[in-house]
Amino acid sequence: MDTKPKTTTTVKVPPGPMGYVYGRACPAEGLELLSLLSARSGDADVAVAPLIVGLTVESGFEANVAAVVGSGTTGLGGTAVSLKLMPSHYSPSVYVFHGGRHLAPSTQAPNLTRLCERARRHFGFSDYAPRPCDLKHETTGDALCERLGLDPDRALLYLVITEGFREAVCISNTFLHLGGMDKVTIGDAEVHRIPVYPLQMFMPDFSRVIADPFNCNHRSIGENFNYPLPFFNRPLARLLFEAVVGPAAVALRARNVDAVARAAAHLAFDENHEGAALPADITFTAFEASQGKPQRGARDAGNKGPAGGFEQRLASVMAGDAALALESIVSMAVFDEPPPDITTWPLLEGQETPAARAGAVGAYLARAAGLVGAMVFSTNSALHLTEVDDAGPADPKDHSKPSFYRFFLVPGTHVAANPQLDREGHVVPGYEGRPTAPLVGGTQEFAGEHLAMLCGFSPALLAKMLFYLERCDGGVIVGRQEMDVFRYVADSGQTDVPCNLCTFETRHACAHTTLMRLRARHPKFASAARGAIGVFGTMNSAYSDCDVLGNYAAFSALKRADGSENTRTIMQETYRAATERVMAELEALQYVDQAVPTALGRLETIIGNREALHTVVNNIKQLVDREVEQLMRNLIEGRNFKFRDGLAEANHAMSLSLDPYTCGPCPLLQLLARRSNLAVYQDLALSQCHGVFAGQSVEGRNFRNQFQPVLRRRVMDLFNNGFLSAKTLTVALSEGAAICAPSLTAGQTAPAESSFEGDVARVTLGFPKELRVKSRVLFAGASANASEAAKARVASLQSAYQKPDKRVDILLGPLGFLLKQFHAVIFPNGKPPGSNQPNPQWFWTALQRNQLPARLLSREDIETIAFIKRFSLDYGAINFINLAPNNVSELAMYYMANQILRYCDHSTYFINTLTAVIAGSRRPPSVQAAAAWAPQGGAGLEAGARALMDSLDAHPGAWTSMFASCNLLRPVMAARPMVVLGLSISKYYGMAGNDRVFQAGNWASLLGGKNACPLLIFDRTRKFVLACPRAGFVCAASSLGGGAHEHSLCEQLRGIIAEGGAAVASSVFVATVKSLGPRTQQLQIEDWLALLEDEYLSEEMMEFTTRALERGHGEWSTDAALEVAHEAEALVSQLGAAGEVFNFGDFGDADDHAASFGGLAAAAAGAAGVARKRAFHGDDPFGEGPPEKKDLTLDML
């Protein structure tokens, strides 16, 4: 396997401090906007906000910096001092530690701090505990305001800090350079800045964490140096402890959170450290291994303590240590993406008032709620994968034989309260007698404590998590019974509520109530088998290979080795360019809008009669046929491209960026990205553990320290081997930049000196920049040398991919969406007897069942039927895509892909297809959906919620999430979206004798079905990705270039549609009414589109709902709704007087044209088939040409 060689680029960064404390008067404008984007709990004066130019930092803010992190002695006598500089980038979050109360809370949920403290104790994680000497020397927010000349009651103080040194501030290893204060302008406001520097500046050659920072007599302090007062602010230190260190501690299974902070800080200061960073006394969670078997270690299952599993525990801590080291490397990286600038956000264009701007931001954040819900409720989400299991040796007879898949991550949220074990497997004192929940089959309810743990026990992040969950659908769209919040609150006035967090007046907004409303979607951990990881990431490139055939005939495959052609010539002959030409021509014909691929363009004005339909379909067919023929001619004759092999190797592919500024402008979204990255890092590290253990005495006390560097190097060697692409940079200081820093002798209130010399500690940076995700286009069988288990798995998949040998309903075929949309124009008389409303379901069902009276069909009708049937049969014969087109864009792309598959002799199996579930937002569809935001609770809850619904414009955050699906991913990916998808990382060696480990990031599934997202369906031939677009919202738009199968309303309705019949619409409506009852009236056109993926039927459903409400005189009545549906069914079931019927079954067959319809029908059918290509024959295209002709030509096919 060839990989791109590592390229080294020189990047110049300015020297500077490792952070700033910003102080400003509370802004009059933009406060509502900042509140929406921030994470804040109502019971705390602190918050986490995003770093945004124009909102929290000034214009021109440099994201990358060579931060001063220490000093070193130089010169012959070691008397001179130079500064040590470390490249890094600023954290995408800023930390508000004074004045946070001026920001509106993210949720009205009460007592979140109490919930986090309770959860922390319950799961055994350490609490924040400042030392007495820290408290004695605290720098309070009031004191800083006084120095800056700000009113403490109206001031806002927040920390802007580099990514790698947040923990250093948390453990008081920094100081404020008060003499270096300056002023900047944010918006129209003047803002003070105080630089933050490390205490290590005053300790030359000391590259470690200072354990006692307030000891001014430390022996490492340089002679005559004026040691400053360390910066300790209790609210800030606690905020960093909870929001920064807490999530990492949960992900790495480290109960001693303070030790994680010190380990991360040490890795930041000491670039040469390679040994263990996490403490030796780390504890482990006790649980039964997967499949109900006892825990096991390779050689010591029965003799290393009562629980066994020694190697499992060792792999757990070493993989966590390696992941922490890898995260530290990424935190020191220099990235290209600038920080977000609110003045350039497209979503704010034209929004003149602060309320309108806040409303636009609120609507966008509600989009992201769908992705947050998927990460919380998917059972294989990175948020839940917090424990390590052991599958045992690959070869039971040879325990030393390494396996990449022996150790793996499993969901641990529900077992986090189990007893803790020490290194030897003994229960830690204090945990005796605790019950042990099983890894599989437990009965634990997902509760507020679990949600707090997912957020690292940070009340601020928990508040923002609830902000998103309050905007998630509880299951109504898939037919689940959603809790009546009003009734629940009213009934709870007489009963006890187990949360102990709320009162009757605040119960509607309580975290417990929100989780109760979403109870039907709670994750259910029914399996602990090794599988995919549900990750949150960001697509930051407008380029992706997500067309129907992926990267088939891509630039890299067509480029000649001699480099004799220019890039443009090669690109014009790729499959990608051919699809772009087809879409451009369709757009020129006004059939499609490339920016909105699901739109019908101007077809409503173009298709005014049946002749126009013929023209549209023929134009699409001829256009695609022409492009495919030209493409294949260029590939075969011009480039001698191995077109069949190219198809077998084709992949759908995209890349997820690790650049922190590509994530959404919200602290919680940044948390999801961080937890996803940590899960990926640990997965890679765990794959190397067994190889490190093989042949070693793992029981030795010094094993971890000795072999942690070995594991770390193995993980670093995985870069650029197919999955984790890395970048190598040479870092240099900006030209002419002076190194300004505090004087080492004059004190921290003295002005900065610019006479320092400095050296960059990490001149050459190698760090991962993106994750590559791919999915094979073709279903691949097991290779000849695959294991028996692998062959069995492939055999079980074959039936899912096997193309059935049945004729497809015309309305479910390639032209179904046009026939339903334009039925009244194409067949104006195609309506049931006694009805004035043309009905496509009735018409085509009767026609295909040979029940349609022939007298109802005109000569023109017969010609059109012949045309439609012939095209549908031709398409069906070559179709290997398990999806029916829903619009012209999909029809053209599917037809094009099928034509290429025909040239390549593809047969038997469906190909893999991609579907994007696009997150959207809307105002609350019902009063119930707005209950959590009601200004008053208790007895006045319903009235308060109705008042809010009556004045939605005054509530910019009152939006809820929704979804729509799209099967053409390239325009979706061009919007550079935030995504959630399943990721399975396979590892394998290269050629024989090569010990290089390659990986592949395989596009997999989210587990949890409709719990994760209501539009996910169980279909092995489809890969899903949840997407929230960024381009056009928070960044500039670019030009276009397996859980268990769950029976849901969505699948029930699509099953009714698939069965067909004249009464499809009424059957769908009846099923929905029986499932949802009065909630049916809440479904908007967007909900119906999401459920049915059929625009015509969705409009029919809205009409049924309107008629049902009219029948009930404005009130919903299930009886009235069913009556309306049954009347519609009776209408379309009438076939009129008996007589000769139209024989659709025989109509259109090649041998029966004349007998069935006479000359006219034969001519119509013949005309419809003129453009058909001859079938592709021959096993060996080379064998069909003349013997003397060596090159393959298209005519041979």
UniProtKB/Swiss-Prot annotation:
Any one GO molecular function term: single-stranded DNA binding
Q: Where is this region: Required for nuclear localization?
A: 1172-1197
Q: Which InterPro entries match?
A: DBP_sf, Viral_ssDBP_head, Viral_ssDNA-bd
- Quick one: signal sequence residues? none
Q: Where in the cell is it found?
A: Host nucleus
Q: Where does each unnamed zinc finger lie?
A: 499-512
Role summary: Single-stranded DNA-binding protein required for DNA replication. Plays several crucial roles in viral infection. Participates in the opening of the viral DNA origin to initiate replication by interacting with the origin-binding protein. May disrupt loops, hairpins and other secondary structures present on ssDNA to reduce and eliminate pausing of viral DNA polymerase at specific sites during elongation. Promotes viral DNA recombination by performing strand-transfer, characterized by the ability to transfer a DNA strand from a linear duplex to a complementary single-stranded DNA circle. Can also catalyze the renaturation of complementary single strands.
What is the similarity comment for this entry?
A: Belongs to the herpesviridae major DNA-binding protein family.
Assembly: Homooligomers. Forms double-helical filaments necessary for the formation of replication compartments within the host nucleus. Interacts with the origin-binding protein. Interacts with the helicase primase complex; this interaction stimulates primer synthesis activity of the helicase-primase complex. Interacts with the DNA polymerase. Interacts with the alkaline exonuclease; this interaction increases its nuclease processivity.
Q: What is this protein called?
A: Major DNA-binding protein
Give the species this sequence originates from: Human herpesvirus 2 (HHV-2)
Q: Give the gene that encodes this protein.
A: DBP
